[in-house]
A protein has these predicted regions:
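Conserved alpha-helix/loop element of class I SAM-dependent methyltransferases that forms part
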Residues: 31-58
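A short SAM/SAH-binding and catalytic strip from SAM-dependent methyltransferases
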Residues: 125-139
Length: 275
């Protein structure tokens, strides 16, 4: 990992050190013990939405892995190798403890997902569930994911929806009114009395689509998720209620494939057939 992290990464590392002590370390055993893959705060089953590629035999890098419970699920469902990358030592300590306890053979690397010290084209799939997809600059981490993927490899990530972000006030729970512009959003600096100051990144769908295309990705799938019928408010991440999430999508999943052609190169022209 480079000696100097961006200032927002330093703040986010401090926030996740506190969050690990307050919640994620205590919840890690239950998450790692789970066999079913579920998505986000509403635990939407992968068996219902079927957005992941076939995992059997894949080498996967999780960018912003936290305690790496999702990486554990990927390994249980057939991934040959899973490497988790994160900048927060406390989160990685918890992940290593869980890995030893459950014996799944995950690997871990302390590094910034915007600049991972690994060779080009090392993985078949890059993944992030509220990791790099939320806490890193998309203009940096998405091209980095592309660099790490082999041609034809896939990027799958979950983040907040446009609607959630424009309805989220600085200090209150989400509401039903637009409180901030989507245009020019990109970076949001938050202050929380419990965990401290943090920085998230969010760009609109059209901007994100262009970032993916510039990095050499073709978008394969896109899903917006609502709270499930039996969903309840999350015990720790309480800024979005189940009631709100049952009416409007609060989470979204993107799946993209690294093109086998050079980023920015035009597709081969086809000769017109004579009639």
């Amino acid at each position: 990992m480079p000696k100097r992290l961006p200032e927002y990464a330093v703040r986010n590392r401090e926030v996740w050190t506190v969050s690990n002590a307050n919640y994620t370390a205590a919840s890690a055993t239950e998450s790692w013990a789970q066999d079913e893959i579920t998505w986000g705060r509403w635990h939407t089953p992968e068996s219902e939405i079927k957005v992941l590629p076939q995992l059997r035999g894949l080498e996967v890098i999780e960018l912003g892995c936290g305690t790496a419970y999702f990486g554990a699920w990927l390994k249980k469902h057939g991934a040959r190798r899973v490497l988790g990358v994160d900048i927060t030592p406390a989160q990685l300590d918890t992940a290593r403890e869980m890995n030893e306890k459950f014996g799944l053979g995950l690997e871990f690397l302390k590094a910034n997902a915007e600049a991972v010290p690994l060779p080009d084209e090392s993985f078949d799939m890059a993944f992030s569930e509220y990791g790099a997809s939320l806490w890193c600059d998309p203009d940096l981490w998405i091209p980095e994911a592309a660099r790490l993927l082999r041609p034809g490899g896939e990027l799958v990530f979950m983040r907040s929806t446009d609607l959630e972000m424009v309805c989220s006030a600085d200090t209150e729970r989400i509401g039903t009114q637009l409180v901030r512009p989507l245009k020019g959003m990109h970076r949001l600096d938050w202050t929380d009395d419990e965990v401290g100051a943090s920085t998230e990144f969010h760009v609109s769908h059209s901007e994100l689509f262009q970032i993916l295309r510039r990095a050499g990705f073709d978008v394969l799938d896109f899903r917006e998720l609502y709270a499930t019928e039996d969903a309840v408010d999350h015990p720790y991440y309480q800024y979005v209620t189940a009631e709100w999430g049952s009416q409007w999508p609060s989470e979204e999943i993107w799946r993209a494939k690294k093109s086998r052609r050079r980023p920015g190169a035009p597709a081969a022209r086809r000769r017109a057939k004579k009639t």
